[in-house]
Amino acid sequence: NNNPILISLILSKKVLGKYLYYTPRGPLLKKTANREEAYAFYLTEIKKYLKAKNAILFKFDPLIEYIKHDKEGNTTTEDNNQQFVDFLKKNGAKHRGFTIGYTDEAQFRWSYALDIKNRTFEDLTKDMNSRCKRSIKKAEKYPLMVKDVTDKTIKDFKDIMESTAERQHHGDRTLSYYQTLKCQLKDIIRMCLVYLDKEKFIDDINRGKYSIDEKVLDIIKNDERIMIPISAGIFIFDKNRFNYVYGGTYAEYFSLMAPY
């Protein structure tokens, strides 16, 4: 009846005459659909497609919650989706485990969710650990400013993301990718830059408002820009969620706690 219950974005990459295929955070499924039935059909059909396309690998990472944890990483329930993991294995999939930290995988296996409905900023900070509270307080004392990325400043954004990717040993997107992201998602995306007001910062230092490492101070003084971009982030609205997708910061400015 032309009423789709499952959708899937499939990306391909040619390697030595063969193809690698990847479905990022998918496939996506309607809540009313029978999950195992829909996935069984999808996997059967995708195998036929991949065989015809001379594929050597198909990777997918469904956006399906496995089990809930508290902020310390401890499980809060015994209910999990292991049955579905086993179902996928029976259908030929290989699970790479619940890895932690930076890996060669495109998507992280862990995500942090914060319920902000009917809660003030003061309410939220009560649940934060002491380190996070200190970082926010420290960032607030510096002359930092958040601005949306424009066509003129998107290169600054890209430079920060590239520097972060190199430091963390993972790949980065191209400038054209970020430009397309900004253009196509429009009202549901925020691409932000955090700037340091150089003149105000140096004036504060001279007045003894706070101190800073001499090497960092020299870097700031030698930068010819009045507003220095030091941190960046991408945020996407998704119905009732505001997702922090990814971000970056120049290593030399870590002490300013700009992401906070």
Question: Model-found features: residue ranges?
Answer:
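A conserved beta-strand-loop-helix scaffold within acyl/acetyltransferase catalytic domains
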Residues: 1-17, 65-72, 92-107, 111-255
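Acyl-donor binding region in acyl/amide transferases
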Residues: 18-104, 225, 239-260
